[in-house]
Regions:
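Long, hydrophobic alpha-helical segments that serve as membrane-spanning/inserting helices
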Residues: 1-44, 62-165
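Structured inter-helical modules in multipass membrane proteins
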Residues: 42, 50-54, 58-61
Length: 165
């Protein structure tokens, strides 16, 4: 993880490209994994699509976060956004543990937290939208966080379905 106190945008293009390439390469493993585990291909394809979407959204979030200096400082000081990002990291970790242990229970607990976070972000957007002060990068960044939360919820549901098979 990077410190929020970075002065310059980190160079992550090659890392993001490698992540995206690796996500696309996983497509070739869907059919053998489906045959071996008897989990429908549609679940694996959904997980792979969401994985690819998350990597692309991460790249868009980075672009919005570093778009302009003033918007960067506004985003840096937004407590709700930081809390939501920490929660998303915790959700990803709980998904990893659920997959490792084969237990979908921790994933169910995350859905409610995620819905609360999305609602807080919606309120944040609505408050700024009424004031007509929102810059495009800030609005885009908050919206991308809401979409990331939605994608994580979909991923959680697919993983739960796979673990129940």
């Amino acid at each position: 993880a990077f410190s929020p106190n970075l002065l310059e945008r980190p160079r992550l293009e090659s890392h993001l490209q490698k992540l995206l390439t690796d996500a696309v390469k996983m497509r070739g493993l869907i059919a053998p994994a489906s045959k071996e585990t008897r989990i429908p291909k549609s679940i694996y394809e959904g997980i792979q699509t969401i994985n690819r979407n998350l990597v692309c959204m991460l790249e868009l979030q980075i672009n919005a976060y570093w778009a302009t200096r003033p918007s960067h400082f506004v985003l840096l000081n937004a407590q709700k956004l930081r809390d939501t990002q920490r929660m998303m990291q915790q959700i990803l970790l709980s998904l990893v543990h659920a997959l490792y242990e084969g237990n979908p229970q921790p994933v169910f607990a995350n859905t409610e937290k995620l819905n609360d976070a999305v609602e807080e972000l919606r309120q944040l957007l609505n408050n700024h939208h009424d004031l007509k002060v929102v810059e495009t990068p800030i609005y885009g960044y908050v919206w991308l966080n809401m979409e990331t939360a939605h994608q994580l919820e979909l991923l959680s549901n697919l993983i739960c379905r796979a673990l129940r098979k």
